[in-house]
């Protein structure tokens, strides 16, 4: 398929604000799609990489400016002036393409595959002189582009497509195009993480095919998520009685895949951390009695001297570490607490009830202290006994407890009433930082006030819900402390615009934010604002696609209005 067709779709979607109309346009487009499903659907998501691929093109704005200059024979200074004028390098590329003095005699039509493969190729260029090679390769792609194509190729390269299309809209469009349910599309995508494959299955096999997609060892999936409960009674009301009540550990949730001696470790945000945890790989090889298995566990750091658990921020150092890995493994050892299993020796287990999955997990885990153990848990129906177990967990320094429906299947990628978490803290939200302000006086040189946003899952946009500057320290006194300097260094690479003291950053850094209540507010696009927000911690284990949604914020607000929600 010619890329021009996809660029025309992008252009149309960019002008439409109504979600229903966006869905209809994409559905019509998908119905006519004959091939190149993988490439087309990834580009529609504004990327050329699958969610589990830790890759990027490695071309920043300066490199794109050079590529535009080379491709269209325009002075670099002129390109920079256009950027100042329009503030969007996609539009700059479109204008520069229209302005070029010497057009190719034979303009070869670009295909979707051409664009996809070239952008992937750029990401793979490494070594000496790689930046120049990337820019030349990108410039060659732009040479063959028409103005509108150039606009979206540049935006794709910068991962800023700006067409207001997220997973929710794509899900609904696939459902309409092929007469299947959105639930079936979402289920299949949560396992495959490939909308191109989901489209192919929906087209060829329909609803039944989507519900029958299978997990593959060595390929990650989206894990099941918990909803929150405010007390023991509410937790039982959601999951039913009796329930499995398990300790909630303050660590990193891992999905662990094993095939023979090969082991893969992924975090919740689908980050491959196999290399960072050689000790965990050895534990799985030696203590998990299965040839092929996919299970979940919490990796928790502990202090060798005191035998006490370490705070989450301490173990997060290991996830970020790229060197001295063996040394770090000795300094911050971790142990695994296994809590669920979804695949064993060729058998798909997601549709089995939790009590059966737990029994299978118990059979394959060869427990050893400070290596791997099953999560501590009890089966209970009594409020008082459940509350006592909850208090016991808190007294041991654990984060809280999980209540689980004994008869529930495993629902990947969704917050459903099959498991809930109960913690003693204020209500918190996982949000992404989208803007900040430079400090003054002794805080000059640091970003000190942070604008946080929630996800509109349909459009993929991030809508602001407040500004927060508390919960952050000037000096690090404990391992779990967050400093202004630390947040500033994390955000600096993602600054893309500055207006006076305010900077705008790409939505990359996720923080957990506590608050007193949610209020309606015309100040923010979301229509809501957090009252007395405070940053609790940086969520290195959360991706921007996993943060709390606007729907979640609306839900909490409605609960408050009904007098149900009490802090």
UniProtKB/Swiss-Prot annotation:
GO molecular function: ATP binding; DNA binding; DNA ligase (ATP) activity; metal ion binding
Cystines in this chain: none
Cofactor(s) needed for function: Mg(2+)
Pfam families assigned: DNA_ligase_A_C, DNA_ligase_A_M, DNA_ligase_A_N
Enzyme class: ligase
Enzyme Commission numbers on file: 6.5.1.1
Record key words, sorted: ATP-binding, Cell cycle, Cell division, DNA damage, DNA recombination, DNA repair, DNA replication, Ligase, Magnesium, Metal-binding, Nucleotide-binding
Reaction it catalyzes: ATP + (deoxyribonucleotide)n-3'-hydroxyl + 5'-phospho-(deoxyribonucleotide)m = (deoxyribonucleotide)n+m + AMP + diphosphate
Active site: 248
Highest taxon in the source lineage: Archaea
Residues given in the record as ATP binding sites: 246, 253, 268, 298, 339, 415, 421
CDD domains associated with the record: Adenylation_DNA_ligase_Arch_LigB (cd07901), OBF_DNA_ligase_Arch_LigB (cd07972)
Gene Ontology BP terms: cell division; DNA biosynthetic process; DNA recombination; DNA repair; lagging strand elongation
NCBIfam families: dnl1
Family: Belongs to the ATP-dependent DNA ligase family.
Biological function: DNA ligase that seals nicks in double-stranded DNA during DNA replication, DNA recombination and DNA repair.
Listed name of the protein: DNA ligase
GN (gene name): lig
């Amino acid at each position: 398929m010619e890329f021009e067709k996809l660029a025309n779709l992008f252009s149309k979607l960019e002008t439409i604000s109504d979600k229903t109309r966006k869905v209809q346009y994409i559905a019509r487009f998908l119905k006519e799609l004959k091939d190149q499903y993988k490439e087309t659907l990834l580009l529609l998501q504004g990327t050329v990489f699958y969610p589990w691929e830790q890759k990027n093109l490695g071309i920043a704005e300066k490199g794109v400016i050079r590529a535009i200059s080379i491709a269209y024979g325009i002075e670099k200074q002129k390109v920079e002036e256009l950027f100042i004028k329009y503030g969007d390098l996609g539009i700059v590329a479109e204008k520069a393409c229209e302005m070029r003095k010497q057009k190719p005699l034979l303009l070869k039509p670009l295909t979707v595959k051409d664009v996809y493969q070239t952008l992937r190729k750029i990401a793979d260029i490494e070594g000496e002189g790689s930046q120049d090679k990337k820019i030349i390769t990108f410039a060659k792609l732009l040479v063959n582009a028409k103005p509108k194509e150039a606009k979206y190729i540049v935006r794709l390269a910068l991962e800023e497509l700006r067409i207001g299309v997220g997973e929710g809209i794509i899900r609904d469009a696939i459902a309409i195009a092929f007469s299947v349910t959105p639930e079936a599309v979402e289920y299949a995508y949560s396992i495959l993480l490939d909308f191109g494959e989901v489209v192919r299955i929906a087209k060829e096999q329909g609803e039944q095919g989507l519900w029958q997609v299978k997990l593959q060892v060595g390929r990650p999936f989206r894990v099941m998520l918990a909803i929150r409960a405010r007390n023991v009674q509410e937790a039982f009301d959601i999951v039913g009685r009796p329930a499995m009540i398990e300790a909630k550990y303050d660590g990193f949730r891992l999905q662990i895949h094993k095939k023979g001696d090969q082991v893969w470790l992924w975090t919740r945000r689908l980050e491959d951390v196999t290399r960072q945890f050689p000790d965990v790989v050895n534990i799985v090889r030696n203590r998990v009695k299965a040839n092929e298995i996919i299970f979940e566990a919490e990796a928790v750091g502990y202090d060798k001297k005191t035998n006490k658990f370490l705070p989450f921020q301490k173990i997060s150092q290991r996830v970020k570490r790229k060197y001295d890995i063996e040394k770090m493994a000795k300094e911050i050892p971790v142990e695994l607490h296994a809590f669920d299993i979804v695949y064993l020796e060729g058998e798909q287990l997601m549709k089995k009830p939790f009590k059966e999955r737990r029994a299978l997990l118990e059979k394959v885990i060869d427990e050893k202290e400070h290596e791997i153990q099953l999560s501590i848990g009890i089966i209970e129906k009594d409020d008082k006994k459940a509350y006592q177990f909850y208090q016991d967990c808190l007294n041991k320094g654990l984060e809280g407890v999980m209540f689980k429906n004994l008869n529930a299947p495993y629902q990947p990628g969704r917050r459903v009433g099959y498991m809930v978490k109960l913690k003693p803290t204020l209500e918190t939200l996982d949000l992404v930082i989208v803007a900040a302000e430079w400090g003054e006086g002794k805080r000059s040189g640091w970003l000190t006030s942070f604008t946080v946003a929630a996800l509109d899952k349909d459009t993929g946009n991030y809508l602001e819900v407040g500004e927060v500057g508390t919960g952050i320290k000037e000096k690090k006194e404990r391992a779990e402390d967050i400093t202004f300097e630390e947040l500033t260094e994390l955000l600096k690479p993602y600054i893309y615009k500055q207006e006076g003291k305010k900077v705008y950053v790409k939505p990359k850094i996720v923080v957990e934010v506590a608050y007193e209540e949610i209020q309606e507010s015309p100040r923010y696009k979301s229509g809501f604002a957090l009252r007395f927000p405070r940053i609790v911690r940086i969520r290195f284990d959360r991706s921007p696609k996993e943060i709390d949604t606007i729907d979640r914020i609306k839900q909490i607000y409605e609960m408050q209005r009904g007098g149900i929600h009490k802090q």
